């Protein structure tokens, strides 16, 4: 199974990339994690609908057919660590690859959010995109460690 993190926005600070890379290399071979950064649409004088449409096109191009789509959304379901671990286990048992989508500065197109298989949120707080990448991969690693009985997560 593969976890694909699709993030709108390409540049993140070095510290965020270093932290992301550190967690990404911890995953076992049977649970591959891949990051695909997609370009943010330049604002200019474009309408929000135009920005959403351009970013949606790039996001969809980055996600292979048959992949389960999970969007990170402030209105999504809040999960505990144990609940995320169970969700990860369910995804693995389902056998499909999973794409976790992080929207750009304006979020994700409402129709794309609604069409996703699932909507989850990491926090009630508004977080910078670089931080979201790091928090997401850390929480996915933590969920894996719970399921694997690895000592990373402690009760």
Curated annotation (Swiss-Prot):
Amino-acid positions noted as binding S-adenosyl-L-methionine in the UniProt annotation, renumbered to this chain: 72, 103, 122-127
Family: Belongs to the RNA methyltransferase RlmH family.
Subunit details: Homodimer.
InterPro entries in the record: Alpha/beta_knot_MTases (IPR029028), RlmH-like (IPR003742), tRNA_m1G_MTases_N (IPR029026)
EC number(s) given by UniProt: 2.1.1.177
Subcellular localization, as worded in the UniProt entry: Cytoplasm
Record protein name field: Ribosomal RNA large subunit methyltransferase H
Organism: Acidovorax ebreus (strain TPSY) (Diaphorobacter sp. (strain TPSY))
Gene designation: rlmH
